[in-house]
Curated annotation (Swiss-Prot):
Changing K72A: Increases KM for NADP 10-fold. This is 2-dehydropantoate 2-reductase. Catalyzes the NADPH-dependent reduction of ketopantoate into pantoic acid. Signal peptide: none annotated. GO terms for cellular component: cytoplasm. It is found in: Cytoplasm. NADP(+) binds at G7, C8, G9, A10, L11, G12, R31, N98, A122, E256. The active site is at K176 (proton donor). PANTHER family: 2-DEHYDROPANTOATE 2-REDUCTASE, 2-DEHYDROPANTOATE 2-REDUCTASE-RELATED.
Amino acid sequence: MKITVLGCGALGQLWLTALCKQGHEVQGWLRVPQPYCSVNLVETDGSIFNESLTANDPDFLATSDLLLVTLKAWQVSDAVKSLASTLPVTTPILLIHNGMGTIEELQNIQQPLLMGTTTHAARRDGNVIIHVANGITHIGPARQQDGDYSYLADILQTVLPDVAWHNNIRAELWRKLAVNCVINPLTAIWNCPNGELRHHPQEIMQICEEVAAVIEREGHHTSAEDLRDYVMQVIDATAENISSMLQDIRALRHTEIDYINGFLLRRARAHGIAVPENTRLFEMVKRKESEYERIGTGLPRPW
């Protein structure tokens, strides 16, 4: 397949490496146009992939079979809209990011839209990307009209396993959102690795109760206990990890809070549900962000 990967951060480089190794034709797409992008990845087994790949070639984009978007949630909408007119109208766009809410911003996109969520963990260490842990990627249609692209899951399964297709991806996205609503803000506020959250079961349960109430009103069956158990599993499995939001806060970058607890707040408001704990966490992270964004440009840069 011919694939353009939009966003060449940790997750983007992980996919570029895996696609290259399987013989797919790939290019990266960078915010600041460059003729190539450097991919420098250390795999979980310690092997190194170090290549310069084509980047920002509009002719390549115009003949791509897939646009894989691995940007931060707040970067997605502007970036995808800027490329949509060059991309064939039949080429699916697969979004893989934390949080929810980008689909609502892309309702007018004509290409098939797919949503994904992944438990693969990768982080930047200087100029190198470390593939910290293998995981599973769930993908499915973002909107009712987006159809069956399960063949993509089969192809991507051979590239970076495991990949699973869901006709109802929204339920999976909500489960992942519950995890993100707990782990990301709490670790960002307390400046701690994921495992430290084990010591705060009441706080976790409080957040899960609020998230479960919203998920039920969204039409997906769940319970606070189920969500809590799932969150605790993820905390145990990723105990040593530094969450993406804490990494952003430490690097004085814009976080994805608007698409995590912020998205939950918007859906809660639509259903008339009070979510005081999620509101408190959202406001605390926004306050942290504003402290350094005021000192910098005052505004997050566009993608």
